[in-house]
Amino acid sequence: MPRVTRADVAHLARLSRLALTEAELDRFAGQLDVILDAVAKVSSVAGSDVRPTSHPLPLTNVYRDDEVRPSLPVGEVLAAAPAVEDQRFKVPRILEEE
């Protein structure tokens, strides 16, 4: 006997504002049962001696020191820009003033 019924899926769809067909209700009810069975199996295997973790291996960020290096001259950079105003890039306005 399925634990997730068509009525359960229809209720979740309404709450989620999803329009599901009759075929989708049947298919998703079966799929959700399979998913819940898999979660139950994992839950039964994972004991209290297993720490919860988001990754199987520890993650370590590798940082490097900032290094100041020469860059292009301002004039050369602005020469490649499509529009310039007062030694700055000119871009289209996207926000209205109030």
Swiss-Prot record:
GO terms for biological process: glutaminyl-tRNAGln biosynthesis via transamidation; regulation of translational fidelity; translation. The keyword Ligase applies. Coiled coil: none annotated. Pfam families: GatC. The keyword Lipid biosynthesis does not apply. SUPFAM superfamilies: Glu-tRNAGln amidotransferase C subunit. One of its GO terms (molecular function) is glutaminyl-tRNA synthase (glutamine-hydrolyzing) activity. It catalyses: L-glutamyl-tRNA(Gln) + L-glutamine + ATP + H2O = L-glutaminyl-tRNA(Gln) + L-glutamate + ADP + phosphate + H(+); L-aspartyl-tRNA(Asn) + L-glutamine + ATP + H2O = L-asparaginyl-tRNA(Asn) + L-glutamate + ADP + phosphate + 2 H(+). Keywords: ATP-binding, Ligase, Nucleotide-binding, Protein biosynthesis. Its EC number is 6.3.5.-. Heterotrimer of A, B and C subunits. Belongs to the GatC family. Allows the formation of correctly charged Asn-tRNA(Asn) or Gln-tRNA(Gln) through the transamidation of misacylated Asp-tRNA(Asn) or Glu-tRNA(Gln) in organisms which lack either or both of asparaginyl-tRNA or glutaminyl-tRNA synthetases. The reaction takes place in the presence of glutamine and ATP through an activated phospho-Asp-tRNA(Asn) or phospho-Glu-tRNA(Gln). This is Aspartyl/glutamyl-tRNA(Asn/Gln) amidotransferase subunit C.
